[in-house]
Each structure stands twice: as structure tokens, then as C-alpha cells.
A protein has these predicted regions:
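Membrane-proximal N-terminal soluble sensing/regulatory segments of transmembrane proteins
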Residues: 1-48, 52-196, 206-222
Length: 226
């Protein structure tokens, strides 16, 4: 965290200042050859690098904390949708089973052909279609959770971009599927979870930009220590 960083940075700065003071006293003692001048420059470069690293690490800590918080909230929303979809899939399957049971009884009676056809139409056009959509809702919610976990570990800008494009596509489909939930209470619950997932791309900076910034900071820190 930032407190630990500040404490460690202060120790390094104090050591660097001690080195600078030592070199200064060496000059005062009359040592002033080229090697000492070179050490002076190395000391100044070291101090400048330490300050730059400290600034970058401070930025990294803040960005990392922000990303972790946003991903945690979005993972909770994705898991909530997945849990909700379990109930919706079960309800849809129960509805389809009930219609199939009725259909089995109807087809045994010749004088109820029209009712049989109506039941078959409902099974195909409503119950099975609803079950398919709820299955997809569960699948997309689970995939969204996996993508969010992958984002926190993404190691290249291209990987972040791929996750962003894939996740945004998933969220668009999830939004359509949640709007198709017939139960108003569960539809409202799903809508609240979707608000969090939609904000993934809407915030500025969003989670993808934050991850890209972290990768850039890592590259800058790496270049300083080379």
C-alpha cells in the first residue's frame, strides 16, 4: 500500500542522500579526479531514477486498487446473474415439462387435435425458446466472470483489447436476455446487476483503460531498472 511505499522510498532517498554527502566530502578533501566526477553523475542519476520509480509505483498502487475494486464489483454482478439464471432455467424447464405432459395426454385423443397443435406451438415458440434464452443468460454470465478474471491478469495490450471486445459483446447479449425475463421482480434484479456490467465500458477511465495504464507503467518501471 501507499504507506509502505512511502516508508521504503524514504529509506532509499536517505541512503541516496548519504551517498551524495559522502561524495561531496570527498571533493572537499581534495579528491577531484575524473572517476570521482563520474561517481557524482552516477549518484545524481540514481537519485533521479529513484524519484521517478517512486512516482510510477505510487501511480501503480492507486490504479491497481481501483482495478481490483471495479473487477470485484463486476464479478459479484456476473455471479449474481449466473445464480439468478439458475432459477430462471429451472422455471423454464418446468414450464416446458408441463406442456410436454399435457401434449402427451392430448395426442392420445383424436378429437383434441387442435388443442394438441396449440400446445405444440406453445412448446416450440414459447417454452423451449425461453429455456434456450435462459440457458444463454447463464452461459454468458459465467463467461463474463471468466473474462473479468482474465482481465486482471492480462499481460499485453492486445490481450486487453480482445477481452474488451469479447466482454462488451457478452454484455450486450446479456442486456437483451435480461430484458426478456418475464418475472418483473427478477427482471428488476437482473437490471441492477446489468448496470454494474454496463459501466465496465462507460466509466472514464474504464477497467480496460486502467489495465492498459498498468501495463504501460510496468514497462516504464522495467526500462528504468535496465
Amino acid at each position: 500500500n501507499q504507506v509502505i511505499r512511502e516508508e521504503e522510498a524514504q529509506k532509499l532517498f536517505e541512503q541516496a542522500e548519504t551517498l551524495r554527502d559522502t561524495l561531496k566530502r570527498t571533493h572537499e578533501y581534495g579528491y577531484d579526479d575524473a572517476r570521482l566526477t563520474s561517481l557524482d553523475q552516477l549518484a545524481e542519476d540514481l537519485i533521479a531514477t529513484l524519484h521517478e520509480q517512486n512516482t510510477l509505483v505510487a501511480q501503480r498502487i492507486d490504479l491497481s486498487a481501483s482495478l481490483t475494486s471495479d473487477i470485484r464489483d463486476s464479478l459479484a454482478a456476473a455471479q449474481g446473474l449466473s445464480d439468478l439464471s439458475e432459477t430462471l432455467v429451472s422455471n423454464a424447464a418446468s414450464g416446458a415439462t408441463a406442456v410436454i405432459s399435457i401434449l402427451s395426454e392430448l395426442i392420445e385423443e383424436q378429437d383434441r387435435i387442435d388443442e394438441s397443435m396449440d400446445a405444440l406451438d406453445r412448446l416450440l415458440e414459447e417454452d423451449l425458446y425461453l429455456m434456450e434464452r435462459m440457458f444463454e443468460l447463464r452461459l454468458r454470465a459465467s463467461q463474463t466472470g471468466l473474462l473479468l478474471n482474465q482481465l486482471s491478469r492480462a499481460a499485453t495490450p492486445d490481450e486487453v483489447l480482445w477481452i474488451e471486445e469479447t466482454l462488451e459483446k457478452n454484455v450486450r447479449i446479456l442486456e437483451r436476455r435480461t430484458l426478456g425475463i418475464s418475472d418483473p421482480v427478477r427482471r428488476r434484479q437482473a437490471g441492477q446487476m446489468m448496470t454494474q456490467l454496463i459501466s465496465l465500458s462507460g466509466d472514464t477511465p474504464n477497467v480496460f483503460e486502467t489495465r492498459q495504464s498498468l501495463l504501460e507503467i510496468d514497462r516504464e518501471i522495467g526500462s528504468l531498472v535496465e
